[in-house]
C-alpha cells in the first residue's frame, strides 16, 4: 500500500484540513463517524482510499492526518465540529500559547516544546502504514506557527524519514490582502529553511483565490470557508490519483519526477477549472477543450503571476470525471498550435496527463456547481519567480529599517539568519532566471570568456 500522511500546521493548515477531509469523506462515501457503508472489506483491505484512511477492526475509517497548532481555539473547532468522531483525539495536538505571528516563536521557543510530541504521533501513524510514501504538509507562509513550526517539523521529518517525499501546500501571503505586517519576514525565513527539505511545494495565493471567488462564483465578500473549499477541490484533484484507481495513476514521487527539473525549482503553479457557480453551469457546456483552455488563463491560477511572461518547464494535466484520452489529446494539440505558451527550449513540449474516472464531488450547500468533468493543471513555470520577487521587495523595505526585527531576535534568533535567508531567496530568483534562458544563448556567452 502507498500511504500518505497529511500534516496540518497552524490555523491556515487546520482550516484547509477541515475542508479537505470533509471533501474526501463525501468523495469516498465515508460518514462523519467514520463508517463507510460501501466498504465490503472490513478492518483492512487494499482499497485505494486506504492511502489516506486507515481502518479499525470495527470498520471505522480514520484519516491518516495530524492537526497541530500552538494555540487551541482552531483545533477545538475540529474537536467539537461535525467530524469530531472521525479523528482520533491524539491526532489533534495543541499547545497553550500561540506563536503570535512570529517565526522565531514557532521555530525556536514555543515550537520546540511540542515538536517531539508531534513526531511521536506521526510515528504512530507511520507504524500503521505498510509502505508509507510520504507526507503532505499544509501550512501558511505568513503565520508564526505555519512558518516557524512547519519548517522545524520538516527539518525533523527529514532526519527521521530521510527518503520519504514531502509535499507542501503553502498559503502564500497575498499581495493586497494581508493578515500580518511581518508576513514577508516569516515567508522568507520559512522558505529558506524548508527549501532543501521540501520535494515539491504547491503555493496558493489568498488574493488569487479571492479573485476567483469574486469573479467566477459571484461571491461579493468571500470568507475563509469559501476560499478553503476551493483550495480543498484543488488538493482533492491533486490527490485523487492517489485515492482512486484511474487510467493513469500518479503517485507522490511521480509528481516530482515530472515537475521538478532541478531540486530547488520545485514550486509548481496550480490552476483549476471549471470554477463556476450553479446558476452559470446550467447554461454552459464545459467540454474538455474548454476546461483545458481555461487552465492557461492567468485568471484561474492559484498564484498571481503571468505565465505569458515566463516559460514552462513542465506541465501536468490531471483530469477527473467524464474524460476520454481522445478529447484530451485533441485539446492539448490545439493548445500547442496556439503558441501563446512558451516552453523552455531544453524541454520538449511535454504534457503529462492523468485521467481519473471519479467525477468531482461538491460539498452540499457550497458555492461550486456539480460538474461532469474538471481539470487541475500543475505547471512548473519561470513566472512564479514574480511571486518571490514581490516578497523579497517587501522584505527589503522593512529590513532596511530593521523594523520588527527585535521580536525575532528576542526569541533567540540571530540577525544573520535574515540576511542568510534573503541571500538564499535572491539565489532562488537567479535560479529561475537562468532556467528560462535559452540554452543556445547561454553556450554562446560561455564561449566568449575563453
UniProtKB/Swiss-Prot annotation:
Gene Ontology MF term list: GTP binding; hydrolase activity; metal ion binding; structural constituent of cytoskeleton
Protein name from the UniProt record: Tubulin alpha-3 chain
Domain notes: The MREC motif may be critical for tubulin autoregulation.
Annotated positions of the Phosphoserine modification: 48, 439
High-level lineage: Eukaryota, Metazoa, Chordata, Craniata, Vertebrata
PANTHER family named among the record's database cross-references: TUBULIN
Intracellular or extracellular location(s): Cytoplasm, Cytoskeleton
Free-text function comment from the UniProt entry: Tubulin is the major constituent of microtubules, a cylinder consisting of laterally associated linear protofilaments composed of alpha- and beta-tubulin heterodimers. Microtubules grow by the addition of GTP-tubulin dimers to the microtubule end, where a stabilizing cap forms. Below the cap, tubulin dimers are in GDP-bound state, owing to GTPase activity of alpha-tubulin.
Enzyme Commission number(s) of this protein: 3.6.5.-
Amino acid at each position: 500500500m502507498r500511504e500518505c500522511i497529511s500534516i496540518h500546521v497552524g490555523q491556515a493548515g487546520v482550516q484547509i484540513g477541515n475542508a479537505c477531509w470533509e471533501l474526501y469523506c463525501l468523495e469516498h462515501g465515508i460518514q462523519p463517524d467514520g463508517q463507510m457503508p460501501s466498504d465490503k472489506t472490513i478492518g483492512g483491505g487494499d482499497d485505494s482510499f486506504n492511502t489516506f484512511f486507515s481502518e479499525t477492526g470495527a470498520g471505522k475509517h480514520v484519516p491518516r492526518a495530524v492537526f497541530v497548532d500552538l494555540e487551541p481555539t482552531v483545533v477545538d473547532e475540529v474537536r467539537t465540529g461535525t467530524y469530531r468522531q472521525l479523528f482520533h483525539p491524539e491526532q489533534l495536538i495543541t499547545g497553550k500559547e500561540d506563536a503570535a505571528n512570529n517565526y522565531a516563536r514557532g521555530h525556536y521557543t514555543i515550537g520546540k516544546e511540542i515538536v517531539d510530541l508531534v513526531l511521536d504521533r506521526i510515528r504512530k501513524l507511520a507504524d500503521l502504514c505498510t509502505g508509507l510514501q510520504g507526507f503532505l504538509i499544509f501550512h501558511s507562509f505568513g503565520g508564526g506557527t505555519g512558518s516557524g513550526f512547519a519548517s522545524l517539523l520538516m527539518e525533523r521529518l527529514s532526519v527521521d524519514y530521510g527518503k520519504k517525499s514531502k509535499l507542501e501546500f503553502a498559503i502564500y501571503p497575498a499581495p493586497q490582502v494581508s493578515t500580518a505586517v511581518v508576513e514577508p519576514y516569516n515567508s522568507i525565513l520559512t522558505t529558506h529553511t524548508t527549501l532543501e527539505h521540501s520535494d515539491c511545494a504547491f503555493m496558493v495565493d489568498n488574493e488569487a483565490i479571492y479573485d476567483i471567488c469574486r469573479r467566477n462564483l459571484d461571491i461579493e465578500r468571500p470568507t475563509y470557508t469559501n476560499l478553503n473549499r476551493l483550495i480543498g477541490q484543488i488538493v482533492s484533484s491533486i490527490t485523487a490519483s492517489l485515492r482512486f484507481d484511474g487510467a493513469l495513476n500518479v503517485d507522490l514521487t511521480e509528481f516530482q519526477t515530472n515537475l521538478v527539473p532541478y531540486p530547488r525549482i520545485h514550486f509548481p503553479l496550480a490552476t483549476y477549472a471549471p470554477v463556476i457557480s450553479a446558476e452559470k453551469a446550467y447554461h454552459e457546456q464545459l467540454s474538455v477543450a474548454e476546461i483545458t483552455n481555461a487552465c492557461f488563463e492567468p485568471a484561474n491560477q492559484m498564484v498571481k503571476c503571468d505565465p505569458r511572461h515566463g516559460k514552462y518547464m513542465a506541465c501536468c494535466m490531471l483530469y477527473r470525471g467524464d474524460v476520454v484520452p481522445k478529447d484530451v489529446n485533441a485539446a492539448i494539440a490545439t493548445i500547442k498550435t496556439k503558441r501563446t505558451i512558451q516552453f523552455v527550449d531544453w524541454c520538449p513540449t511535454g504534457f503529462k496527463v492523468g485521467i481519473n474516472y471519479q467525477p468531482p464531488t461538491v460539498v452540499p450547500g457550497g458555492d461550486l456547481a456539480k460538474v461532469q468533468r474538471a481539470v487541475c493543471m500543475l505547471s512548473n513555470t519561470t513566472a512564479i519567480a514574480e511571486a518571490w520577487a514581490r516578497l523579497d521587495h517587501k522584505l527589503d523595505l522593512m529590513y532596511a529599517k530593521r523594523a520588527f526585527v527585535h521580536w525575532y531576535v528576542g526569541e533567540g534568533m540571530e540577525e544573520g539568519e535574515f540576511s542568510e535567508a534573503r541571500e538564499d531567496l535572491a539565489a532562488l530568483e537567479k535560479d529561475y532566471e537562468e532556467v528560462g534562458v535559452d540554452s543556445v544563448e547561454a553556450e554562446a556567452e560561455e564561449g566568449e570568456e575563453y
